[in-house]
């Protein structure tokens, strides 16, 4: 399985990253990508930008640990997680989670699992910049609830259908 985990300030090309994952591969039958963008509005307030901070070293290690958990749960052939940090303007890409498998079910489930983890447990902190000033963003109850569905015993890995 190919795995790419990157934390970076620079923007990245989502299509190029997906193409890199599948280049020369004939065993991949499904690729699921999730791309998170900086919205221009937060609770009715126009957003100029977000500033994302992370714990260097720990963030990469924690993401890698959850990628390994996803591999144990689903028959994955590739995973890419790229997360930006620093100041990110409205409309810019923040995060990419891409998963590849022989079949779509595993790719969809793994991408959802990894994104739920990134939203709730990864060591990132988000500050929003609006015309009213800046404020740190608290975790959302809905994100925690979404992540809870993965806390039970994972289903037995099924052979490719």
Could you say what each language-model-derived stretch is?
Residues 94-101:
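Short glycine-rich or small-residue beta-strand-to-loop segments that form or flank ligand, phosphate
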Residues 1-94, 108-112, 116-161:
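N-terminal, polar/charged subdomain of small-to-medium soluble alpha/beta proteins
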